[in-house]
């Protein structure tokens, strides 16, 4: 699955199951974190050494890793990596309650590496594991978004760069200078606090979301088959007013993001 296919698959997942992540101010923040965490969608599975840190996952009851091999078995997967048995269990519970799927990520953790599920772990993280993330995204508070995703500010400058790229593409601008000129800002080509604040405001005012530039990929059948369904979830059958039913939105386009 190439990078363009991953972009299309991720956006399709957000469109269908992301609910508030489809709001452009939120989407720009979400994509910035995803692109940094996954190295521009190049890495969707933790490389296992094991390193010294990875060896520390062994026998950690606080992580839910209570059985031999749990550290490797529940290694990081998806565009924002889900790790630990406890989190795979929580993801399973959320997808079942929200979408009615029978997939069991705790029993079959490798399902999270299948293209048919790409992005669902990151969506769960923003909507369920760290519920305050949506509030910070809507406020345009990229520092707090980063702290909640990372636990600190590691790679902060790269996350800012990705935010600039994603926000510009979602708004249809090619460069920072183009946006600054349109927004009546000082045109210096530097994206600082004022430019990012203006990007956030501009995203908040967009009423229609631009269309995706890539066709959705054919989903992989590589995931193991068992009596537990390993298929990607169907759209929720609940009423649109039900808080458990994410509201689908038009698909945005960010194919030009490097």
Residue ranges and their predicted role:
Residues 34-37, 136-155, 181-183, 194-203:
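Acidic helix/loop microenvironments that form the catalytic cleft of cell-wall polysaccharide enzymes
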Residues 18-30, 43-46, 132-146, 187, ...:
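Surface-exposed patches in mature extracellular/periplasmic domains of secreted proteins
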Residues 227-258:
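Long, low-complexity, intrinsically disordered segments
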Residues 1, 16-21, 29, 69, ...:
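Second-shell loop/turn segments in exported
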Residues 171-218:
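Short acidic, glycine/serine/threonine-rich helix-capping segments at coil-helix boundaries
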């Amino acid at each position: 699955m190439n990078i363009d296919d991953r972009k299309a698959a991720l956006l399709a997942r957000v469109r269908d199951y992301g609910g508030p992540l489809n709001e452009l101010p939120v989407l720009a923040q979400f994509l910035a974190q995803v692109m940094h965490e996954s190295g521009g969608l190049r890495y969707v599975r933790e490389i296992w050494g094991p390193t010294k840190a990875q060896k520390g996952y062994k026998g950690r009851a606080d992580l839910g890793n209570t059985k031999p091999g749990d550290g490797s078995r529940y290694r990081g997967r998806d565009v924002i990596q889900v790790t630990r048995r406890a989190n795979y269990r929580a993801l399973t519970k959320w997808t079942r309650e929200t979408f009615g799927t029978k997939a069991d990520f705790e029993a079959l953790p490798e399902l999270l590496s299948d293209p048919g599920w790409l992005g669902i772990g990151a969506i769960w993280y923003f909507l369920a594991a760290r519920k305050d993330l949506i509030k910070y995204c809507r406020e345009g508070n990229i520092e707090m978004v980063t702290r909640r995703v990372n636990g600190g500010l590691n790679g902060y400058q790269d996350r800012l760069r990705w935010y600039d790229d994603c926000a510009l593409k979602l708004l249809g601008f090619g460069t920072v200078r183009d946006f600054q000129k349109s927004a009546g800002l000082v045109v210096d080509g530097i994206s600082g606090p004022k430019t990012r604040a203006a990007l956030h405001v501009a995203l908040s005012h967009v009423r229609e979301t631009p269309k995706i530039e890539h066709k959705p990929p054919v989903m992989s059948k590589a995931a193991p088959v068992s009596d537990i369904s390993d298929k990607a979830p169907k759209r929720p059958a609940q009423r649109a007013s039900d808080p458990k039913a994410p509201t689908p939105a038009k698909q945005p386009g960010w194919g030009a993001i490097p």
